[in-house]
């Protein structure tokens, strides 16, 4: 993510002139400069991003006064839609830094993280075509958005406590309710979750009753990878998935018993880590939590701020709309390789990568 500001920064560094713009889910880049600089520019861009496909063409010389990000335009062809990405390490550090202006701001993002797919209204992917267009940038955020060297340059979902979305309940209030054994509905990236303390079996049983859910284990949200290791055995491959920008639920072998109300007697646990700032802040206050989609089993995940009231539990919500519902992804590692049990948040709407296979010739009768 953040291809255009990264291209701008590299071009400025290498003395390259030209333009870069969104074209309906793709990027068109025109660059002019010395041969060695252009080669370095291309290599560094390719190293910085997972580029699925690109075409390179030599054009007649055009003089440019500098390198600029130009206005997005539509284009034909199959577009590239960006997935939602978990809070990056830089944003998490700022979130927990009392000296930072975004300290404890539950909607902190940058070019490397935050909601994309779930907040997009249309392509090309620009702020005015996301739900964040409803939140005009304050002068400080506008300065970051327009500064090439800033990691929030052209980051479409940025905001701050002064100009961004607002919570409907204080996080500490929600944490206190959870400590008291309450079930709380929490608005996530792709929908609402029903949450309860993993240390409170009656609260977990209440979630099962609300959802009309039979003997099917619940996933557990842990504060960090160290806490996951207290309860589960974690291989290198599993840890890589847990810490990835997709933040999926990963099926792990347990090593410390969890209540049967969570596991239903299984020796495996669906574990995952916080994928957004609101979860990070909540887990700082109480952890681990049972976290499951707010729905009646078999029904779609709830995204509506009014419909969530049907569950009859306190609600920790906010005024940033969810346009596209999406559930948490679920994977397990089999023989060292990740296998999807549910491909969703963090991976959708990316194309499924090709899998190698062998053609078998079946004998004829």
Task: Tell me what each language-model feature is.
Residues 78-79, 92-100, 128, 144-150, ...:
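Flexible, glycine/proline-enriched loop segments at strand-loop-helix junctions
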């Amino acid at each position: 993510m953040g291809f255009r500001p990264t291209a701008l920064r590299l071009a400025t560094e290498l003395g390259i002139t030209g333009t870069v713009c969104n074209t309906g889910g793709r990027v068109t880049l025109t660059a002019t400069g010395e041969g060695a600089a252009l080669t370095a520019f291309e290599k560094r861009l390719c190293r910085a991003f997972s580029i699925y496909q690109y075409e390179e063409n030599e054009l007649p010389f055009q003089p440019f006064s500098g390198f600029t990000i130009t206005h997005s335009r539509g284009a034909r062809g199959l577009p590239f839609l960006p997935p939602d990405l978990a809070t990056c390490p830089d944003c998490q550090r700022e979130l927990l830094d009392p000296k930072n202006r975004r300290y404890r701001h539950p909607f902190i993002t940058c070019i490397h993280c935050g909601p994309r797919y779930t907040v997009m209204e249309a392509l090309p992917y620009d702020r005015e075509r996301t739900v964040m267009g409803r939140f005009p940038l304050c002068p400080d955020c506008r300065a970051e958005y327009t500064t090439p060297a800033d990691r929030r340059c052209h980051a479409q979902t940025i905001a701050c406590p002064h100009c961004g979305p607002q919570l409907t309940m204080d996080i500490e209030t929600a944490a206190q309710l959870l400590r008291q054994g309450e079930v709380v509905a929490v608005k996530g990236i792709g929908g609402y979750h029903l949450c309860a303390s993993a240390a409170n079996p009656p609260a977990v049983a209440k979630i099962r009753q609300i959802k009309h859910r039979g003997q099917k284990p619940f996933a557990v949200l842990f504060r960090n990878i160290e806490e996951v290791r207290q309860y589960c055995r974690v291989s290198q491959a599993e840890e890589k998935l847990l810490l990835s920008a997709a933040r999926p639920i990963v099926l792990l072998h347990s090593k410390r018993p969890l209540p049967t109300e969570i596991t239903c007697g299984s020796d495996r646990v669906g574990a995952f880590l916080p994928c957004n700032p609101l979860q990070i802040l909540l887990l700082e206050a109480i952890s681990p939590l049972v976290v499951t989609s707010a729905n009646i089993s078999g029904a779609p995940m709830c995204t509506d701020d009014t419909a969530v009231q049907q569950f009859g539990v306190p609600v920790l919500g906010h005024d940033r709309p969810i346009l596209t519902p999406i559930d948490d992804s679920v994977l397990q590692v089999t023989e060292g390789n990740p296998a999807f049990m549910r491909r969703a948040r963090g991976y959708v709407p990316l194309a499924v990568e090709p899998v190698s296979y062998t053609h078998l010739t079946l004998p004829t009768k």
